[in-house]
């Protein structure tokens, strides 16, 4: 990612990249209020979306958030979503210094320091920050990323530098995407009154009004007169906006994917019931004593690798923001030539500090799954029903009725979510969706290695906790045994041989078996259940029509999937939960389209139809 080159000129941040000031050098604070943050009225609605081209130093955001928080809750939206695109990275300490030099620091200190505490490294991606009733999605990408996003803004801040020095931020391509991501009466706020900007806005259906500017002759405001329709060549992956009879949600399964999802749903005011077949938490793969938070390390530009990196860093930021966890890092080792080749190609990646055959991931570390899952459920205030083994559902009158073993029935749920990990294989029967149930066994040893962070190679070693050290894990697609096996413990020990002296005697004090859920392409499966009959009929000619407009997919009910997280559920569950909440609650979709397509439940069928099979 590009680093911003800036200096102070006339006591104001000045960009050397664009030869322009970041904002008005005489009164930037009041100009931002006049042009952007105080130029519209709040609407008392569920979700209010502000999108911004050019985050800069974040002044517009902090002014907007401050105004939002100071407004009486009954006179503002329930949730504020603020989406801001920024292509030029400013270092954390430099941001703080800018606010101090401008004399803004004390005014924004609390919000700014909360922001800086979780400020990410200089790497492209979408990074979510949690504030009171507000989500900030800071998008570190070029402005062309808009074509990958999906939301309908209420307000646009068209910021950026002067149009004659940064024309890309105001050109026709940008305004096309702005129009696509707007709805009827969406308001455009901008300091500019450039004629070519007015022309582009009018071309895509905006009514343009000239108005008095801040200490100058004029500026413009614009309003979208009618929501535009655009051709969608991949409508089979596009969202269908949900309509809910109530805010009751049922989640089947009580592992990590369920716990994160329950927490995220609780932030949106949903009533959550979780059903678990076991008598307590932690009986499945999410119940290990210790585990590691880490990332796959693949070659650059590999979709699975990039998704794993984003999942990892956002999970780390989530656990730090929500549970106040601290991570000391994790060390990954290249234990064969292929892995070493991957490590060698990632030396410029800021997530990985690579030296020879080692990669240190500063944001990773040891996790304690049982405690983590328990704490998230407690924060969510979800009601957990143990000893409830799910059998079937019935959907009628826009609600689900659930049947459990022993003739237990629960009803009146507007949303049903499958999050039962490896057991999902017994309830999802699409022809093209191939799921694997993979057995894994971890071994509990008496402490034998003093390490402050996990070590991961052929197997992993966790730091000592409560006089116990966890190593693992085995991997077996063919074994369905629930019982621990001596040969698996032996294999786990053999796989950590590189870390211990050959004369070291290890004492096994226990082990635990769990089952992972995998898809055939290693991406998680997250999104709406789909109507297989409709897909096969409507998209049967995709081999010949894949470059033409497609009909929007039919969704028969609010059944959602959240499974196939493999061995990295503590990373991927965070992105999954945010994406599902966006679908259920009609929010900005949060993920880029390339990732939405990669995790979509219908992707296997669509690939087959595109081949004419």
Swiss-Prot record:
Keyword RNA-binding assigned: no
Q: Which ranges of the sequence are coiled-coil?
A: none
Entry superkingdom: Bacteria
The cysteines covalently paired via disulfide bonds are: none
Q: Which InterPro entries match?
A: FAD-dep_OxRdtase, FAD/NAD-bd_sf, MnmC-like_methylTransf, SAM-dependent_MTases_sf, tRNA_MAMT_biosynth_bifunc_MnmC, tRNA_MNMC2, tRNA_S-uridine_synth_MnmC_C
Give the E.C. number(s): 2.1.1.61, 1.5.-.-
Q: Which SUPFAM superfamilies match?
A: FAD/NAD(P)-binding domain
Give the location in the cell: Cytoplasm
State the reactions this protein catalyses: 5-aminomethyl-2-thiouridine(34) in tRNA + S-adenosyl-L-methionine = 5-methylaminomethyl-2-thiouridine(34) in tRNA + S-adenosyl-L-homocysteine + H(+)
- On whether Transferase is a keyword of this UniProt record, the answer is yes
Q: Where is this region: FAD-dependent cmnm(5)s(2)U34 oxidoreductase?
A: 252-613
Instruction: Note the Pfam families from the entry.
Output: DAO, Methyltransf_30
Question: Which is one Gene Ontology cellular component term of this protein?
Answer: cytoplasm
Cofactor(s) required for function per UniProt: FAD
Record-stated family: In the N-terminal section; belongs to the methyltransferase superfamily. tRNA (mnm(5)s(2)U34)-methyltransferase family. In the C-terminal section; belongs to the DAO family.
Please explain the role this protein plays, according to its UniProt record. Answer: Catalyzes the last two steps in the biosynthesis of 5-methylaminomethyl-2-thiouridine (mnm(5)s(2)U) at the wobble position (U34) in tRNA. Catalyzes the FAD-dependent demodification of cmnm(5)s(2)U34 to nm(5)s(2)U34, followed by the transfer of a methyl group from S-adenosyl-L-methionine to nm(5)s(2)U34, to form mnm(5)s(2)U34.
In terms of NCBIfam families, this protein maps to: MnmC_Cterm, PRK01747.1-2, tRNA_MNMC2
Q: What is this protein called?
A: tRNA 5-methylaminomethyl-2-thiouridine biosynthesis bifunctional protein MnmC
Organism of origin is: Campylobacter jejuni subsp. jejuni serotype O:6 (strain 81116 / NCTC 11828)
């Amino acid at each position: 990612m590009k680093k911003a080159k800036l200096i102070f000129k006339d006591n104001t941040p000045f960009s050397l990249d664009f030869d322009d000031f970041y904002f008005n050098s005489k009164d930037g604070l009041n100009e931002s209020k006049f042009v952007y943050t105080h130029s519209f009225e709040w609407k008392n609605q569920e979700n209010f979306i502000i999108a911004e081209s050019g985050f800069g130093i974040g002044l517009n955001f902090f002014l907007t958030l401050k105004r939002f928080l100071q407004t009486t809750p009954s006179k503002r939206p329930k949730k504020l979503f603020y989406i801001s695109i920024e292509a030029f990275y400013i270092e954390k300490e430099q941001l703080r210094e800018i606010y101090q030099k401008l004399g803004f620091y004390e005014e924004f200190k609390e919000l700014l320091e909360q922001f800086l505490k979780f400020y990410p490294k200089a790497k492209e991606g979408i990074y979510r920050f949690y504030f009171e009733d507000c989500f900030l999605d800071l998008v570190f990408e070029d402005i062309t990323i808009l074509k990958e996003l999906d939301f309908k803004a209420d307000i646009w801040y068209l910021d950026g530098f002067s149009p004659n020095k940064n024309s890309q931020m105001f050109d026709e391509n940008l305004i096309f995407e702005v129009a696509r991501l707007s709805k009827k009466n969406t308001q455009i706020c901008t300091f500019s009154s450039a004629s070519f900007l007015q022309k582009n806005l009018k071309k895509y259906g905006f009514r343009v009004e000239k108005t008095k500017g801040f200490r100058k002759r004029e500026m413009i405001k614009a309003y979208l007169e009618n929501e535009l329709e655009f051709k969608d060549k991949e409508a089979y992956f596009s969202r269908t906006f949900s309509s809910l009879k109530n805010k009751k949600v049922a989640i089947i399964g009580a592992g990590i994917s369920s716990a994160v999802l329950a927490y995220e749903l609780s932030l949106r005011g949903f009533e959550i019931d979780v059903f678990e077949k076991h008598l307590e938490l932690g009986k499945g793969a999410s119940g290990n004593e210790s585990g590691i938070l880490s990332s796959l390390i693949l070659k650059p530009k590999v979709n699975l690798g990039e998704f794993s990196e984003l999942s990892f860093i956002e999970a780390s930021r989530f656990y730090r923001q929500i549970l106040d966890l601290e991570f000391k890092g994790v060390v990954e080792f290249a234990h064969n030539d292929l892995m070493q080749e991957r490590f060698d190609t990632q030396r410029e990646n800021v997530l990985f500090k690579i030296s020879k055959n080692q990669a240190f991931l500063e944001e990773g570390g040891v996790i304690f799954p049982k405690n983590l899952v328990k704490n998230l459920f407690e924060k969510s205030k979800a009601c957990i029903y143990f000893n409830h083994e799910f059998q079937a559902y019935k959907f009628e009158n826009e609600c689900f009725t659930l049947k459990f073993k022993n003739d237990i029935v629960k009803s009146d749920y507007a949303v049903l979510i499958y999050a039962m990990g490896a057991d999902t294989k017994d309830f999802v029967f699409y022809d093209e969706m191939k799921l694997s149930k993979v057995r894994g066994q971890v071994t509990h040893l008496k402490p034998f290695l003093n390490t402050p962070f996990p070590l991961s190679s052929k197997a992993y070693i966790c730091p000592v906790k409560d006089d116990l050290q966890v190593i693992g894990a085995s991997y077996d697609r063919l074994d369905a045994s629930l019982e621990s096996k001596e040969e698996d413990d032996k294999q786990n020990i053999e796989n950590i041989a590189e870390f211990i002296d050959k004369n070291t005697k290890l004492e096994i004090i226990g082990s635990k078996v769990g089952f992972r859920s995998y898809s055939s392409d290693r991406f998680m499966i997250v999104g709406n259940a789909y109507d297989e009959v409709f897909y096969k009929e409507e998209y049967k000619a995709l081999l010949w029509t894949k470059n033409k407009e497609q009909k929007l997919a039919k969704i028969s009910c609010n059944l959602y999937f959240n499974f196939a997280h493999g061995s990295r559920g503590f990373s991927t569950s965070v992105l999954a939960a945010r994406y599902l909440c966006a679908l259920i609650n009609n929010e900005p979709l949060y993920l880029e389209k390339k990732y939405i397509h990669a995790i979509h439940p219908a992707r296997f069928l669509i690939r087959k139809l595109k081949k004419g099979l």
